[in-house]
C-alpha cells in the first residue's frame, strides 16, 4: 500500500 524506493521486488501487497 506504499511501494518501492529504488529497486525492491513486488513489495506493495
UniProtKB/Swiss-Prot annotation:
It comes from the Eukaryota. GO terms for molecular function: toxin activity. The keyword Disulfide bond applies. GO terms for cellular component: extracellular region. Keywords: Disulfide bond, Hemostasis impairing toxin, Platelet aggregation activating toxin, Secreted, Toxin. Coiled coil: none annotated. Expressed by the venom gland. Its main location: secreted. It is found in: Secreted. The keyword Disulfide bond applies. Residues 11-13 form the C-type lectin domain. Belongs to the snaclec family. Activates platelets by binding to the platelet collagen receptor glycoprotein VI (GP6). Tetramer of heterodimers of alpha and beta subunits (alphabeta)(4); disulfide-linked. This is Snaclec convulxin subunit beta homolog.
Amino acid at each position: 500500500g506504499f511501494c518501492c524506493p529504488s529497486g525492491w521486488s513486488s513489495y506493495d501487497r
